[in-house]
Each structure stands twice: as structure tokens, then as C-alpha cells.
């Protein structure tokens, strides 16, 4: 059986990414702040601790994003909030033909979203499904890591096509962050979740 793993970054790219993270940390935190407990509790007006705001800026800087938001529940929580923020209950969402990750399926069901499936491995089929359902689809969820062993799609090409169609694109970047050269938002997606 042939597999198609994601292309991992090189050792040199990994080092450069680590330096980028350290640069972002030193731009957003002053000296001793890095070694402190941080600020415990919610700050009036920010509605979160100041330290959280700084960490969010570190993430945004690291991934060249306009903003970042830390949420509870790791990737699952991030996907839940992204779907809730970007789509309305009952909207149609484009997904890959493989099984949807179980915790993501719970959110899709809870929101009453209507999955429309396309084989992301076949760009022509993806284009056909987008054309056929152009008046229905409001957004798309693209998982960067492989869902099925035979998956081979180029998530960058999938995202580019979906953005051409004016769709809101949310990516599930779990298990891909810091391992691939670009996460979803760096490849043009509206929201990266991890």
C-alpha cells in the first residue's frame, strides 16, 4: 500500500522556525516576564490575563497571522469556536470525503451544519462539487494531516481553490504545526485551528 505523508520541514527550517518563535517571544515579553507566573486572573477591559494577550501575539507573529486566540479544549475547542464564529446553524460546509474527526462531528451535529463532501485528492472533482453547490456552501473545513491512508491532496491547492470561490476556509492543523512549512493560515485559510 502506498502512503503520502505530509512533507516535513528540514532540520534547517525547524531551526529557523524556532528562532522565529524566540524572536516573537522577546518582542512581546520583557526580560523577567518569561520566567514569572504571569498574571493570574482576568484584566478588566481585556477580559483575559495580560500574559494571555502576549502569548496570542507570539502565536500571531510566529505564523504571520493578523491575530491569534487561545481557547480551552486544544484543537477541538479551536475548531468548535471557528465553526461557531464563521458559520451559522444549518449552513452547508464542504468537507473531504473521508470520515470527519469524531469531536469535530459533534460540533457539526450540534450546529446542524450540512456537510457536502468532495474528494480533496481530486481537484477536478472538488471544482465540480463547488460548482454544483455554489449557492449552498458557506465554508469549508480542511484537515492538513491525512485522514485516510491513501490521502495525497495538497492542502495548499485545496485552500487556494476554495478561496478563489470566496469560501471561508477553516483548517484543522492539529499534528501539523511546526512540522510543515506552512500551516493553514499561512497557506491562505481564514482560520487555523490547533
Where are these regions (language model features)?
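Charged, low-complexity surface segments at secondary-structure and domain boundaries
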Residues: 2-3, 42-44
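Conserved PLP-enzyme active-site core in the AAT-like
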Residues: 2-13, 18-21, 25-26, 61-68, ...
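A structural motif shared across PLP-dependent enzymes of the aminotransferase-like
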Residues: 13-37, 45-54
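Ligand-binding pocket scaffold of soluble enzyme catalytic domains
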Residues: 49, 57-59, 122
Amino acid at each position: 500500500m502506498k502512503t503520502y505523508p505530509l512533507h516535513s520541514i528540514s532540520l534547517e527550517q525547524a531551526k529557523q522556525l524556532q528562532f522565529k518563535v524566540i524572536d516573537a517571544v522577546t518582542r512581546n515579553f520583557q526580560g523577567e516576564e518569561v520566567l514569572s507566573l504571569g498574571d493570574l486572573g482576568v484584566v478588566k477591559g481585556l477580559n483575559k490575563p495580560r500574559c494571555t494577550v502576549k502569548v496570542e501575539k507570539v502565536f500571531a507573529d510566529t505564523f504571520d497571522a493578523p491575530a491569534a486566540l487561545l481557547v480551552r479544549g486544544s484543537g477541538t475547542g479551536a475548531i468548535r469556536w471557528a465553526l461557531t464564529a464563521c458559520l451559522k446553524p444549518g449552513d452547508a460546509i464542504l468537507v473531504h470525503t473521508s470520515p470527519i474527526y469524531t469531536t469535530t462531528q459533534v460540533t457539526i451535529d450540534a450546529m446542524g451544519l450540512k456537510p457536502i463532501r468532495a474528494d480533496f485528492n481530486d481537484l477536478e472533482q472538488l471544482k465540480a462539487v463547488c460548482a454544483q453547490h455554489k449557492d449552498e456552501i458557506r465554508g469549508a473545513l480542511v484537515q492538513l494531516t491525512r485522514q485516510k491512508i491513501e490521502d495525497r491532496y495538497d492542502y495548499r491547492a485545496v485552500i487556494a481553490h476554495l478561496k478563489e470561490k470566496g469560501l471561508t476556509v477553516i483548517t484543522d492543523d492539529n499534528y501539523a504545526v511546526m512540522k510543515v512549512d506552512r500551516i493553514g493560515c499561512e497557506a491562505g485559510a481564514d482560520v487555523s485551528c490547533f
